[in-house]
């Protein structure tokens, strides 16, 4: 389970060095929901790969439940295949991470020494998340070294979304409390939201409270005030990951632990000048072009959404899903379904733990430029195995709550670089699939 930027880095290395390697990316959105049935359904995708069949494995399981994660890790260890873990130090695996500790330390020292801050709060992401805990440790350790008392070095946890910033400010100001001199945030989403909420309460940033972020997203650079942040080139993580695997394949012994050093960017939100690196007219042009493209795609998606809602069978649902994928910048796709979905009887439920491989069939695909329905699965597997070097196939679960109903496969999904709404699209498909499935079960029960 790896992010778009990391997979982009992997593919870039493969192409730069002419490696005869392709990538199969098994992905889940387990962290998108707290519903245990949904999370279980998402995790089934990781039962699919036979890890021993691969030459190298890249691991990013930071958002998985501990028991589910350990099950996957145990299978990877048993495979004997070299594995590189991203942003989580796992015993027996190579490890690459962002050196967030150093960047947070620099923020704290800068706020203390250059801006005279003496009270601090860390608005953090999920408790237990490895990267977040590293940043919390850097925050607390540095303040301890500076002699800042514990009551002036507080921490709150949330997720990596904007609500965490909003809630942190509300938490600090409830019952007449005042904001500290500085709020150090786990990422830019949190930082921007913290600034907005502080300003609603009458605080000025940076005059009354200073704020820092992390990641250097566009919102950080374009926001007013410009957010002090740390730039992370996540493509470099994927690139370095591929380099480690290539060294292993060539009989070399790379270092077990590697770090990507983020670049600290001081901006207006901590009281420093605008760094002057943004061409605002260029950014505005990009936003205008993007909004026009988004409008076209939104119209197409709305039409497909209506078809999804009106679909009366799973095959109609598949066709509507194919209409959606046809609008996206990719080289092909396949929708694999358990045939029992459409032939449901009360005694014939879908699997909840892994896939019934003998029941999977290709309900629809476009892998060779032509849309087709109901083709043998072996052709899809051959397409993946015989794909040119540098090809990426993204695979994620088609599930109905906890039931393993099938698999989506996207070939070279370039649209992911510019669009981050794939989850919303898939969630729509899964919601309609759940409705169809409930109707079938009701019909089977009545019969």
Ranges and model annotations:
Residues 382-386, 390-399:
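A short, aliphatic-rich beta-strand micro-motif
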């Amino acid at each position: 389970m790896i992010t778009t930027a990391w997979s982009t880095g992997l593919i870039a290395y493969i192409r730069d060095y002419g490696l005869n390697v392709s990538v199969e990316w098994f992905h889940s959105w387990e962290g998108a929901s707290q519903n245990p049935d949904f999370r279980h359904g998402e995790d089934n995708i990781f039962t699919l790969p036979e890890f021993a069949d691969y030459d190298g494995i890249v691991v990013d399981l930071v958002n998985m439940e501990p028991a589910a994660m350990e099950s996957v890790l145990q299978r990877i260890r048993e495979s004997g295949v070299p594995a590189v873990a991203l942003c989580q130090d796992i015993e027996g695996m190579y490890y690459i991470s962002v050196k967030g500790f150093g960047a947070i330390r620099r923020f704290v020292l800068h706020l203390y020494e250059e801006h005279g801050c003496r009270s601090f709060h860390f608005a953090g992401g999920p408790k237990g998340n490895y990267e977040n805990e590293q940043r919390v440790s850097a925050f607390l350790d540095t303040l301890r070294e500076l002699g800042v008392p514990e009551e002036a070095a507080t921490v709150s946890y949330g997720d990596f979304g904007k609500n965490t910033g909003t809630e942190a400010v509300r938490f600090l100001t409830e019952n007449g409390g005042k904001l500290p001199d500085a709020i150090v945030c786990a990422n830019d989403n949190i930082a921007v939201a913290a600034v907005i909420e502080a300003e609603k309460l009458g605080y000025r940033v940076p005059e009354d409270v200073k704020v820092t972020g992390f990641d250097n997203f566009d919102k950080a650079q374009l926001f007013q005030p410009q957010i002090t942040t740390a730039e992370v080139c996540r493509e470099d993580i994927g690139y370095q990951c591929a380099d480690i695997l290539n060294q292993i394949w060539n009989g070399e012994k790379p270092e077990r632990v590697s770090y990507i050093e983020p670049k600290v960017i001081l901006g207006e939100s901590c009281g420093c000048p605008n760094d002057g690196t943004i061409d605002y007219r260029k950014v505005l042009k990009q936003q205008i072009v993007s909004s026009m493209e988004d409008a076209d795609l939104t119209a197409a998606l709305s039409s497909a959404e209506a078809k999804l809602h009106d679909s009366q069978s799973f095959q109609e649902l598949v066709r509507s899903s194919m209409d959606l994928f046809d609008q996206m910048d990719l080289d092909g796709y396949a929708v694999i379904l358990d045939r029992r979905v459409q032939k449901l009887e009360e005694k014939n439920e879908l699997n909840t733990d892994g896939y019934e491989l003998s029941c999977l069939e290709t309900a629809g695909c476009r892998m060779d430029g032509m849309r087709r329905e109901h083709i043998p699965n072996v052709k899809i597997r051959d397409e993946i195995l015989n794909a040119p070097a540098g090809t990426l196939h993204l695979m994620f679960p088609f599930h109905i709550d906890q039931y393993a109903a099938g698999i989506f496969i996207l070939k070279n999904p370039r649209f992911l670089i510019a669009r981050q709404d794939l989850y919303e699209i898939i969630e729509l498909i899964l919601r309609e699939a759940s409705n169809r499935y409930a109707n079938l079960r009701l019909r089977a029960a009545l019969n």
